[in-house]
Amino acid sequence: MSFEGSSLWRLRQKVGHDLILWPGSTVLVEDPNGRVLLGLRRDSGEWAMPGGGAEEDGSFASTALDELRQEVGLHAVRADLIAFACVSDPQDHVVRYPGGDLTHYFGIWFVLRRWEGEPVADGEELLEVQWFDRDVLPAELMHSSAVAFAHYARYLATGIFQVG
């Protein structure tokens, strides 16, 4: 779904650019070689993991699966999503978009290692998709994705669900 017409877009019509608190999900797609899938965002020119805000009647898991399908064309099932962190720290998760909208995201981050399909950018939110080694990420990485990789590294090292 494009931003226009989404639940968040409808709310924006009422509150303008004011701060909105919004639930969402992000998916760290990891292939068998340990590479991660990132998309180049049209709005910011930064690389980021697939993800986005929840829609009405959605859950964290359904949001993750919907965003994965919509943004990069991959299909997965809920049982293959592994939650590794929940996030809400305003220092890391308040985003001011180029148009001026201010959003504080509260979300769950999932890792996904099994899916169907080949990744393809949607052409609307993402201009391209690319696999990266986790240790060699692009300099133009969206801040929230950089935070996600730090949480994921701690999760892998400890096996403990991360809170941030």
Residue ranges and their predicted role:
Residues 31-75:
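Conserved Nudix-box catalytic region and its N-terminal flanking loop in Nudix hydrolases
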